[in-house]
Amino acid sequence: MPVITLPDGSQREFDKPVSIMEVAADIGAGLAKATVAGRIDGELVDACELIEHDARIEIVTPKDDDGVHIIRHSCAHLMGHAVKQMWPDAKMAIGPVIDNGFYYDIDVDHTFTQEDLEKIEKRMKELAKTEYAVVKKKASWKEARETFVERHEPYKIEILDEDIPTDATPGLYHHEEYIDMCRGPHVPNMKFCQHFKIMKMAGAYWRGDSDNKMLQRIYGTAWADKKQLKAYLQRLEEAEKRDHRKIAKAQDLFHWQEEAPGMVFWHHNGWTIFRELETYIREKMREYEYQEVKGPMMMDRVLWEKSGHWEKFSELMFTTSSENREYAVKPMNCPGHVQIFNQGLKSYRDLPLRMAEFGSCHRNEPSGALHGLMRVRGFTQDDAHIFCTEQQVQEEVAGCIKMVYETYKTFGFENIDVKLSTRPEKRLGDDATWDRSETALAQALKNNDIDFSYLPGEGAFYGPKIEFTLFDCLGRAWQCGTIQLDFALPGRLGATYVGEDNERHTPVMIHRAILGSLERFMGILIEEYAGHFPLWLSPTQVVLMNITDNQSDYVRKVVKTLNEKGIRASADLRNEKIGFKIREHTLKRVPYLLVVGDKEVEAGEVAVRTRGGEDLGKFPLEDFITRVEDEVRTRKID
């Protein structure tokens, strides 16, 4: 007779095997009504799952993250149900959960249109309103295969043949006449799948392989209630307004061309911001005693083979040949930095040696994955490598952590999630080395009172890493900074130092990036600030506008003075009404709008307005310059 232990420690005894739903009903009718699924001894299961032995259980409802995840997964099945009713010959591939939603890949002769998506959503709503029960049946591998052969579902058959052992018992979920295969869990009833929206469609190769057939992917979002769905759609609308590609066009920051996919054409305004980011990071590098270096753009394939990158990374590397030698354009900077370290004999007294580079890297990302500045082929890393002894690791990692947090705070990011990624399946080095690496990073985080969680199997192939994820004003997550420990690469490339014992030792290498890709970080900033850059980053910091031609000479003189002081200023001397000029430069998001009339000329002053519409009144020019210089020096965030 199973004894069920609940999260609060209370226990309930049953005289026969009991399901999660029955336990919920025993606790209370309201809880049973809200039950989506459950956990048995930590394992997420369907509400119909029977408990035959003593166990600890948790009830999962739509208020839980797991509950929302399950609702989204079941909405993917609901989409499959609707599509098969409308296009019976459609072949269903996969329908997983993704961030904030789900998708289904579908093979059908009909090309879906926006009108079709609206019809699919309407049919899904009609089906969900009937609140039909979702019935899970466990089948043998053979029974599952026969089911999908009978239903002419080749993708489900392939999944069974290639991915599922023949001794497995796949879960078949019955949505009335529609059957889908999944490990689950899923909602027990479609009453939970009421708050969703079909978002868009795209092409997707089966199994992500361009040699396979292109399928049609339909995306959707789903939430626990109407309020959550509405809030999400509002966030999307705001994100659309903040799209860095639109703002870049409006502010003349950069552009793209088909002749250079994934490569940025920086315009003066955009390059000004880019250089300010570099300048700031250089200041931090000096503060933390890094040496700035510059490695070659291309190196012989032999070096990449020796480093291990060729084996693990070659499909993403651009290559070229010359004089019977094959070269690779660098996708990362670390092998080059080891070569610089190897020049000249190093002693333990030289360690730690902190080496940094604004490395221009290239990766041959699939064209379909490219997305503005967020996913490019040519990018600049604020990359650094610290060569140190094992005894110095924790102190050096602590310094990196401090530098990361200070940098993000400068840009206004203070909500930071930290993950420790551990050994992947494909990796360099032995288990003992990985044990030491993972322990060192975990201890450095604990010693600095950093809350973190583990990402098992997500480390780099050469060592574990700490990942820093920022959350922007819309709640979106951006993984930017990394600190990676590497006991493997220095040894592979022959890096050594002479220790206190006069013997040669291999240094530990710490890979460190804060912004990550400067291009991507700039895209994040454009959207975070919605183009309203803080003064120190703004391409044009001040614009001066005359009211009549009488003030033109004074405006030119003031602009020259400001530029000589290092303040990026421009003049608008057009024969337009002052209100028109103010509106135009407000839309261009220039931080300070200075209006000059006869009175300002006579007094040697400027009338100051902000892009937010605030009238700050008249300032003597020197006082205004002091204000701007202070704001830039402190890198004030609006």
Curated annotation (Swiss-Prot):
Keywords: Aminoacyl-tRNA synthetase, ATP-binding, Cytoplasm, Ligase, Metal-binding, Nucleotide-binding, Protein biosynthesis, RNA-binding, tRNA-binding, Zinc. It catalyses: tRNA(Thr) + L-threonine + ATP = L-threonyl-tRNA(Thr) + AMP + diphosphate + H(+). InterPro entries: aa-tRNA-synt_IIb, aa-tRNA-synth_II, aa-tRNA-synth_II/BPL/LPL, Anticodon-bd, Anticodon-bd_dom_sf, Beta-grasp_dom_sf, TGS, TGS-like. One of its GO terms (cellular component) is cytosol. Zn(2+) binds at residues 334, 385, 511. Its cofactor is Zn(2+). Binds 1 zinc ion per subunit. Its EC number is 6.1.1.3. Residues 243-534 are annotated as: Catalytic. Residues 1-61 form the TGS domain. It is found in: Cytoplasm. It holds the Pfam family TGS. Gene3D superfamilies: 3.10.20.30, 3.30.54.20, Anticodon-binding domain, Bira Bifunctional Protein, Domain 2, Threonyl-trna Synthetase, Chain A, domain 2. GO terms for biological process: threonyl-tRNA aminoacylation. It is an enzyme of class 6 (ligase). One of its GO terms (molecular function) is ATP binding. Catalyzes the attachment of threonine to tRNA(Thr) in a two-step reaction: L-threonine is first activated by ATP to form Thr-AMP and then transferred to the acceptor end of tRNA(Thr). Also edits incorrectly charged L-seryl-tRNA(Thr). Belongs to the class-II aminoacyl-tRNA synthetase family. NCBIfam families: thrS. PANTHER family: THREONINE--TRNA LIGASE, CHLOROPLASTIC_MITOCHONDRIAL 2, THREONINE-TRNA LIGASE. Homodimer. This is Threonine--tRNA ligase. The lineage of its organism: Bacteria, Pseudomonadati, Pseudomonadota, Gammaproteobacteria, Alteromonadales. The gene is thrS.
